[in-house]
């Protein structure tokens, strides 16, 4: 007997759901004898053979983890005092184990279906309440991508709302974090905004500005009193945004109390690891009067059909998927998983615990400053919370060298100054080691004596007087037992991939394998500061370099930037690259962006942000781009044509035959081709956008490449470009190219990039190709099983779809009154998250099963949809009442089941419509949520404790 003595790679079979026999059965149902034959029928001839991925084998889970561990070991974890918006923190173990590492939390989707999302909606409402309380502003959103992009959103927010309409100048304090100023400049330039950086203490006339950004405390550590300067800006009809440190706000007067219009910042230091720069949750808070102009998602309190308190995403008409180029922002994701960590950090510690952390951090800072002064070191400024700037003169360079020799990183400010930031993890020993480092051979100060004699460095006039976090949720769960059970109760309310498939079209809710997730919490990746010297981040640099090469091979592009920390930011970076390319050729006048009418709303919103004008092109009856209309508009605008943004396979789930011709039309008329990579899961290993006409694409690593959705973030949206666009990829002050940063950190959400590295390394080229093929097979199998019950709206010329299919429910609305919303809510009773509703066509469901779902799960979903069709028939023929039926009343709760039953159908039909549900039943915690009530009676902070008790 021959035994394979190598490490067997079973990962591909673990990742892909259907077994060999199931695969063959599905192929037979479609009329094919092999996966390759089916693929050949789906992929257009014009783009076959464009893949350059290769067919190399992947590594086993154990071998890939070992290889990545060796790479991670090349990162050097020095003691960091760099600060600058990034701080060491302790992630409480119960939050790490029960939230961050829990698939019930990290595999969930954005809570657009509120009935199956009450748990994470409550956690996000806690986050909003936390932010509102600490900032002193009444309304806060459910997180943004990072502090720098939140500042950029605040800038455009001020532009929209300022009454100084003739102004195009925005004041940014020189005391803001440098990475924030860099992103402001990137965002401002295409919009014709001038960013004026200066010292607000030296400002004279402010009438030229529509808005201002101030840092609180300042990046150099000082705590300035902004009350007078805010009044001056307001007198000039300008709005004021304040970038505030949340921990400091537990002790300092909040921005809302000195009349700031907006507060933004990062929640990273509330339990979220440094992660070489991300992902972290930013926040955005503002006045109630401005709520409809606020970017990002907003959780609001509403009621369900029984009048019971229920949560939902509020005011969605602000979002880009609805308002397109008129949207407040192109942001379509948030940082939900990280916001939930931060919110639970506050829940666990409570107001007293947060203040203790802040007071201890500040006390250590004050003692450190007193000791340094005693040693003759010049401390700049009289006030501080946790950060000190030291005037070190000509000794600065040697001081950095000496510090690194001792395993310490100081902040590099300039040739004559260094910075020090303390944090939650700082100790007496740290303070004493800094005295020793900076004091040379002098005798050390007496820590105990200084602790007894040193007072606060916070200005007395700015000490916080208002209470924080008085809601019971922040004062109840302080034992680990209570927090563990609270997190479990919330998770039990939600439907995530750990319960059932999430068949959302255009979202690619595939497996997020445990072996891919494990490296995220390794200290070597989690505890590195993004601005640590390059020699200390060699592990990250090797991993990112290898990942860039992997993504180039998968897409056919020549270069990749990993910086964009969401798909929307990848789109933006891609269009900026196109814009910069045209300008480099003396064609800066090219500003027309063609976008098909079927495109996701992010595309036109992004084009607007990049300073382009959107021209919409038509689609034909089969959902394809109308090539003749495209040609006519490309020719009409040829002198100003900048780009086309096109999704491939199409947003309608079809491989359009004319994609090569479309690319040629744009190139012939002087434009560049932006191919949206949202649907890349149908192409990896089969065809490559960089080889069939694309100049740039963004990829959604949280779709195709296995980063989990986290309940609505994090995401990663790297861009791939052809060589002529490579010089225009995003830069960063920490990189060789210092211009054009689109987010705060050089590698964006760096600490989750190992997930994609692991996925590609384990799958190999052959496995990635097979994943694409199986995604296409699963989608076509569902379409074939359901086509006799629901019309499949779009197919290719061969009657096949790509990796997703669209079911048309509009005829059923006409015959039965049953809407797509009714079907979506009824699926909850069957234990399923609804497919994508009414996108890209109103009244339809778009289904994407991915390659990870087994045939059994596909059949379970199909059986549910078929049973729902039978219920619709019963409404059509009068067997079920048109108003009182299981669809109109869905979803059904356990409380309703045990109460008085007045419906004209049975309890069993309501909650056990299929016998298979008896084995495992998901019970929604609320009935159908009233969206209109929630928007008319907007409440975006924690409701009374009685509401929680009722729940």
From Swiss-Prot:
Q: Does the keyword Ribonucleoprotein apply?
A: no
InterPro entries per the UniProt record, alphabetical = GcvP, GDC-P_C, GDC-P_N, GDC_P, PyrdxlP-dep_Trfase, PyrdxlP-dep_Trfase_major, PyrdxlP-dep_Trfase_small
Keyword list, A-Z:
Oxidoreductase, Pyridoxal phosphate
Q: Which residues carry this modification: N6-(pyridoxal phosphate)lysine?
A: 703
Catalytic activity field = N(6)-[(R)-lipoyl]-L-lysyl-[glycine-cleavage complex H protein] + glycine + H(+) = N(6)-[(R)-S(8)-aminomethyldihydrolipoyl]-L-lysyl-[glycine-cleavage complex H protein] + CO2
Q: What class of enzyme is it?
A: oxidoreductase
Q: Which GO terms describe its biological process?
A: glycine decarboxylation via glycine cleavage system
Which PANTHER family does the entry link to? Answer: GLYCINE DEHYDROGENASE (DECARBOXYLATING), MITOCHONDRIAL (PTHR11773:SF1), GLYCINE DEHYDROGENASE, DECARBOXYLATING (PTHR11773)
Function, as annotated, reads: The glycine cleavage system catalyzes the degradation of glycine. The P protein binds the alpha-amino group of glycine through its pyridoxal phosphate cofactor; CO(2) is released and the remaining methylamine moiety is then transferred to the lipoamide cofactor of the H protein.
Q: Which family does it belong to?
A: Belongs to the GcvP family.
Q: How is the subunit organization of this protein annotated in UniProt?
A: The glycine cleavage system is composed of four proteins: P, T, L and H.
What is the recorded name of this protein?
Answer: Glycine dehydrogenase (decarboxylating) 1
Origin species: Pseudomonas putida (strain ATCC 47054 / DSM 6125 / CFBP 8728 / NCIMB 11950 / KT2440)
Q: Which gene encodes it?
A: gcvP1
């Amino acid at each position: 007997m021959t035994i394979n003595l190598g490490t067997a790679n079973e990962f591909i079979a673990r990742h892909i759901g259907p077994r060999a026999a199931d695969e063959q059965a599905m192929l037979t149902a479609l009329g094919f004898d092999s996966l390759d034959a089916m693929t050949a029928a789906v992929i257009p001839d014009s783009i076959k053979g464009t893949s350059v991925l290769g067919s190399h084998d992947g590594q086993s889970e154990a071998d890939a983890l070992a290889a990545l561990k060796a790479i991670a070991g090349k990162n050097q974890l020095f003691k960091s005092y760099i600060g600058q918006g990034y701080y060491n923190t302790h992630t409480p173990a119960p939050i790490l184990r029960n939230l961050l590492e829990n698939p019930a939390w990290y595999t969930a989707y954005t809570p657009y279906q509120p009935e199956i999302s009450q748990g994470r909606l409550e956690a996000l409402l806690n986050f909003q309440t936390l932010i509102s309380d600490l900032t002193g502003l009444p309304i806060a959103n459910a997180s943004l991508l990072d502090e720098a992009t939140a500042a950029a959103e605040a800038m455009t927010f001020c532009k929209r709302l300022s009454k100084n309409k003739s102004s195009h100048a925005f004041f940014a304090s020189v005391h803001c974090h440098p990475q924030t100023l860099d992103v402001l400049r990137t965002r401002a330039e295409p919009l014709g905004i001038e960013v004026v950086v200066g010292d607000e203490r030296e400002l004279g006339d402010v009438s030229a500005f529509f808005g201002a950004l101030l840092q609180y405390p300042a990046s150099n550590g000082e705590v300035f009193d902004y009350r007078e300067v805010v009044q001056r800006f307001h007198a000039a009809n300008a709005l004021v945004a304040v970038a505030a440190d949340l921990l400091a706000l537990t002790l300092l007067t909040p921005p809302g109390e000195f009349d700031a219009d907006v507060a933004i910042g990062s929640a990273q230091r509330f339990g979220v690891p440094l992660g070489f720069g991300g992902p972290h949750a930013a926040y955005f808070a503002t006045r109630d009067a401005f709520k409809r102009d606020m970017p990002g998602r907003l959780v609001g309190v509403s009621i369900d059909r029984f009048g019971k308190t229920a949560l939902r995403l509020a005011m969605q008409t602000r979002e880009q998927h609805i308002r397109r180029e008129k949207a407040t922002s192109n942001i379509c994701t948030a940082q939900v998983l990280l916001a939930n960590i931060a919110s639970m950090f506050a829940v666990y510690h409570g107001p007293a615990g947060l203040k203790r952390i802040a007071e201890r951090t500040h006390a250590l800072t004050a003692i450190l400053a007193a000791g340094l002064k005693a040693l003759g070191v010049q401390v700049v400024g009289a006030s501080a919370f946790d950060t000190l700037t030291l005037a070190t003169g000509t000794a600065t360079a040697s001081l950095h060298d000496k510090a690194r020799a001792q395993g310490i990183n100081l902040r590099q400010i300039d040739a004559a100054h260094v910075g020090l930031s303390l944090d939650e993890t700082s100790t007496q020993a740290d303070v004493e080691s800094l005295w020793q480092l900076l004091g040379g051979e002098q005798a050390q100060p007496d820590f105990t004596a200084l602790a007894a004699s040193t007072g606060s460095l916070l200005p007395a006039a700015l000490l916080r007087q208002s209470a924080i976090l008085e809601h019971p949720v922040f004062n109840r769960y302080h034992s680990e037992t209570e927090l563990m059970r609270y997190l479990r109760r919330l998770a039990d309310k939600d439907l995530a991939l750990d319960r059932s498939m999430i068949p959302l079209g255009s979202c690619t809710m595939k497996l997020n394998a445990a072996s891919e997730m494990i490296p995220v919490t390794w200290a070597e990746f989690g505890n590195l500061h993004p601005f640590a010297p390059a020699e200390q981040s060699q592990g990250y640099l090797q991993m990112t370099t290898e990942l860039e090469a992997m993504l180039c091979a998968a897409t056919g592009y020549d270069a990749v930037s990993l910086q964009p920390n969401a798909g929307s930011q990848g789109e933006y970076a891609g269009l900026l690259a196109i814009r910069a390319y045209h300008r480099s050729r003396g064609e800066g006048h090219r500003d027309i962006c063609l976008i098909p009418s079927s495109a996701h709303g992010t595309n036109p919103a992004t084009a607007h942000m990049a300073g382009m004008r959107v021209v919409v092109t038509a689609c034909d009856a089969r959902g394809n781009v109308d090539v003749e209309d495209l040609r006519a508009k490309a020719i009409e605008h040829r002198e100003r044509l900048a780009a086309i943004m096109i999704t491939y396979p199409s947003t309608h789930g079809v491989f359009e035959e004319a994609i090569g011709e479309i690319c040629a039309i744009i190139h012939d008329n002087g434009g560049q081709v932006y191919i949206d990579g949202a649907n890349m899961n149908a192409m990896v290993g089969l065809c490559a956008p960089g080889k069939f006409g694309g100049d740039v694409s963004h990829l959604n690593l949280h779709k195709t490449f296995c980063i989990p959705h986290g309940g609505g973030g994090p995401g990663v949206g790297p861009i791939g470009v052809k060589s002529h666009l490579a010089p225009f990829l995003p830069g960063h002050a920490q990189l060789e190219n210092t211009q054009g940063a689109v987010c705060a950190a050089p590698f964006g959400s760096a600490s989750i990039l190992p997930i994609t590295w692991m996925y590609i390394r384990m799958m190999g080229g052959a496995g990635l190709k097979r994943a694409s093929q199986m995604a296409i097979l699963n989608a076509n199998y569902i379409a074939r099983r359901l086509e006799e019950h629901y019309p499949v709206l779009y197919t290719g010329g061969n009657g096949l779809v790509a990796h997703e299919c669209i079911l048309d429910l509009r005829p059923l609305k006409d015959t039965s009154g049953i809407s797509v919303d009714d079907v979506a809510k009824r699926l909850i009773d069957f234990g399923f998250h609804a497919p994508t509703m009414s996108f890209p066509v109103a009244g339809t469901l778009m289904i994407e099963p991915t390659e990870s779902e087994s045939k059994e799960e596909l059949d379970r979903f199909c059986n549910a949809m078929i049973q729902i069709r039978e219920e619709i028939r019963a409404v059509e023929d009068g067997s079920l009442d048109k108003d009182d039926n299981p669809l109109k009343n869905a979803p059904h709760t356990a409380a309703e089941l045990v109460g008085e039953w007045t419906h004209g159908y049975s309890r069993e039909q309501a909650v056990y419509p299929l016998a298979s549900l008896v084995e495992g039943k998901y019970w929604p915690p609320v009935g159908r949520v009233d969206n209109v009530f929630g928007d008319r009676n907007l409440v975006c902070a924690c409701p009374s404790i009685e509401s929680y008790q009722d729940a």
